[in-house]
Amino acid sequence: MARLAGVDIPREKRVEVALTYIYGVGRTRALQTLRETEISGEIRVKDLTDEQLVSLRDYIEGNFKVEGDLRREVAADIRRKVEIGSYEGIRHRKGLPVRGQRTKTNARTRKGPKRTVAGKKKAR
């Protein structure tokens, strides 16, 4: 396995796909990186030369925030929103969807398992 940005990327996959294993690098950034470093996306990671690996590593670390730095920045942004009490921060604190999704039905991923509430009792 080759290491880029502190991540072991799979040797058997095409470079274009393997780069997406790095947090913060999706298909668009992977293609942009390959275009800038003039490496074919069709080549497998195991077939990359050392110079190509170094150029990929330098380009990614020089131009993008990836892995730990990006995770820290996202966490800090969320923490800041919670501290200032913005609408988004309140939604984060309550564990509800932040981006305006409906919650009357659905939103189970954020809300957790359904908590059943007892219905109305019958009068005797």
Curated annotation (Swiss-Prot):
RNA-binding is among the record's keywords: yes
Entry similarity comment: Belongs to the universal ribosomal protein uS13 family.
Top-level taxonomic group: Bacteria
Ribonucleoprotein among keywords: yes
Name the record gives this protein: Small ribosomal subunit protein uS13
Endpoints of the signal sequence: none
Biological processes, Gene Ontology terms: translation
Keywords of this entry: Ribonucleoprotein, Ribosomal protein, RNA-binding, rRNA-binding, tRNA-binding
GO-annotated cellular components: cytosol; small ribosomal subunit
Biological role stated in the UniProt entry: Located at the top of the head of the 30S subunit, it contacts several helices of the 16S rRNA. In the 70S ribosome it contacts the 23S rRNA (bridge B1a) and protein L5 of the 50S subunit (bridge B1b), connecting the 2 subunits; these bridges are implicated in subunit movement. Contacts the tRNAs in the A and P-sites.
